[in-house]
């Protein structure tokens, strides 16, 4: 997959719009633009079987962790109006992300 440009950044709050976790909201932990995927806190949970390793002081067992979901399956959440698309205001260095519905600033999230 080609490198995907996205308006979603790390630590943004997003809502899942499709898939098994539809309707859930969470904070973005990591963006993987070359694969078009993101990691969202407490979304897309999978179980990972971990072997014990006494040298590294790892107990072992079944651990739950987030798996990556497609960027197209999430929408940025505006504090005022909920899930929304992103619009841009300004030019050059002054360019900022704003809510497409109400126009509030999303840059400082």
UniProtKB/Swiss-Prot annotation:
Leader sequence segment: none
GO CC list: ribonucleoprotein complex; ribosome
CDD domains assigned: KOW_RPL26
Gene Ontology BP terms: translation
Region (Disordered): 1-24
Domain of life of the source: Bacteria
Keywords: Ribonucleoprotein, Ribosomal protein, RNA-binding, rRNA-binding
Any GO molecular function: rRNA binding
Pfam hit, one: KOW
Subunit structure: Part of the 50S ribosomal subunit.
Family: Belongs to the universal ribosomal protein uL24 family.
Function of the protein: One of two assembly initiator proteins, it binds directly to the 5'-end of the 23S rRNA, where it nucleates assembly of the 50S subunit. One of the proteins that surrounds the polypeptide exit tunnel on the outside of the subunit.
PANTHER family on file: MITOCHONDRIAL RIBOSOMAL PROTEIN L24
Record protein name field: Large ribosomal subunit protein uL24
The species this protein was found in: Koribacter versatilis (strain Ellin345)
Taxon lineage: Bacteria, Pseudomonadati, Acidobacteriota, Terriglobia, Terriglobales
